[in-house]
């Protein structure tokens, strides 16, 4: 497995992966890294938006067959190492308990709530939990 910055040529495959994982596809202005298998096919990606000393985690997607292998953790650490944020924020579906557990393991804490934030295919809406990560100060 290789982690590398995504290129414009990767975007179609990442958009397909995003749809399969029910997350927003990365945009051309986002900072995106992907984890690829030996053939170069994307297994996972993380998309972030840095602003000053903060980072917004916009999307984190892992192919179902590639989950529970540490890809999300490795991608998150790659983004943190590259962007060096003091603080990071994200929104996650209230029903996505697996993602919430992952984010808690990565050091995120519950920070707020957004009512009716996510649209559902049936026209209903779902709440989002806002989570916050804080860098550990180094001396």
Set out the residue ranges of the language-model regions.
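Structural motif
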Residues: 83, 105-106
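Residues lining the SAM
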Residues: 54, 58, 91, 100, ...
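Conserved catalytic-core motifs of GNAT/GCN5-like acyltransferases
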Residues: 89-91, 109-130
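Acetyl-CoA-dependent GNAT
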Residues: 2-69, 73-82, 133-138
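Conserved GNAT acetyl-CoA-binding A-motif
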Residues: 83-94
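Short glycine/proline-centered loop/turn elements that form peptide/ligand docking sites
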Residues: 72, 76, 96-99, 116-122
């Amino acid at each position: 497995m290789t982690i590398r910055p995504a290129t414009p040529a990767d975007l179609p495959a990442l958009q397909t992966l995003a749809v399969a994982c029910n997350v927003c596809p990365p945009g051309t202005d986002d900072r995106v890294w992907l984890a690829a298998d030996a053939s170069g096919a994307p297994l996972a990606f993380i998309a972030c938006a840095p602003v000053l000393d903060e980072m917004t985690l916009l999307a984190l997607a892992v192919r179902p067959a590639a989950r529970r292998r540490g890809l999300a953790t490795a991608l998150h650490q790659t983004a943190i190492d590259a962007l060096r944020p003091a603080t990071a924020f994200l929104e996650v579906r209230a029903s996505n308990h697996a993602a919430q557990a992952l984010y808690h393991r990565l050091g995120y804490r519950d920070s707020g709530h957004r009512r009716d934030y996510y649209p559902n295919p049936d026209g209903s809406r779902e709440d989002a939990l806002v989570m916050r990560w804080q860098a550990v100060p180094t001396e």
